[in-house]
């Protein structure tokens, strides 16, 4: 196993992942054990496995709440969108997901371009 002190983790062998529950595309529900399920928790678990660690989830209602917890030693990694203000206190890696979104209008709407 990797020396835990090399990574500055609080709990030996455990990766604490900050998870934003506010995006249903990335967190889709809960497992039978009550852990969050979806893309973000799966990626956090895969990262932990890659290092030989277990994972624990620290859940927050919004990405802002995850970011605000950065100084509270509540998580070791978090999975939120990059933002210039957040980058002042959080170091971001490349994107792990891209979400394509669009605007919808009712049939017959005069709005054709936004």
Task: Enumerate the predicted regions with their spans.
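A generic local structural motif
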Residues: 2-4, 89-91, 108, 112
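Ligand-binding "clamshell"
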Residues: 85-99
